[in-house]
Amino acid sequence: MITITNRQGKHLSVVVEGLENAPAIIFSNSLGTDHGMWQPQVASLKQQFKVITYDTRGHGQSDVIADTTVQNLAEDVIDILDALDIEKAHFCGISMGGMTALWLGIYQPTRFYSITVANSAAKIWNEEGWNTRADAVIENGLADLVATTHTRWFSEQFDYQHDALAQRTIQSLATTPALGYAESCRALAQADLSTQIQQIQIPTLVIAGAFDPVTTVADGVFMQQQIQNSELAVIDASHLSNIEQPELFTQTLSQFIGSIQ
């Protein structure tokens, strides 16, 4: 694990694995998790790629940063690429990370071969809901969310209790700084890229979870219809589809990336 300093002078925790001179792929975690959620994908893809994972600001080992916007989340990715001297990469983000992917596709397309937008939406939930959740987390901590999160993250078909990565990911929510979580909630409250995503020209993969109650298949269909050079894959999973269906997720991503090079 290395630490890079972003343009705001704050620290981001980054992990680089795989082949030094291979094409780079960078993964961005969901709200309330950390870089470790990508373990199955890293294990598979590091045989042929330079694989970068990082803790989104306010999560894991990365600094909590006040007044965060989705633009800030995306600019952190550019700062990581710059620090690692990577001119261009594939990008895959899930949920909040998917919103980051969309922003990068709109405003920084020259830095990416492709974006993958997993279990996300051009607008996730609503402003009032996010701000209310942020206030509640600041006041009461994350314990209430931890107790119910499995109902949103995983489907009833998935035995999350006996899946080591699912348990570790739930634990990462329990250890996420409340202020970092709340800052991300407020960023998502303000984020709406619905009208801008038509501008995306680079190859885009949209992955939706058939049982996802948070970012629905309809959200995925909307993005696929708006983004010209895009395709949609629906996976039998809930919100964290890369953990619930790791092999299928990785295979879908690999085939998409393979079709570009």
Predicted regions and their residues:
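Catalytic histidine neighborhood in serine/cysteine hydrolases
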Residues: 217-240
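Catalytic histidine-centered segment of alpha/beta-hydrolase-like enzymes
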Residues: 237-250
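Flexible "cap/lid" loop of the alpha/beta hydrolase fold
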Residues: 102-107, 112-144
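Conserved HGGG/HGGXW glycine-rich cap/lid loop of the alpha/beta-hydrolase fold
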Residues: 10-63
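Active-site loop/oxyanion-hole signature of alpha/beta-hydrolase fold enzymes
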Residues: 36-43, 52-92, 251
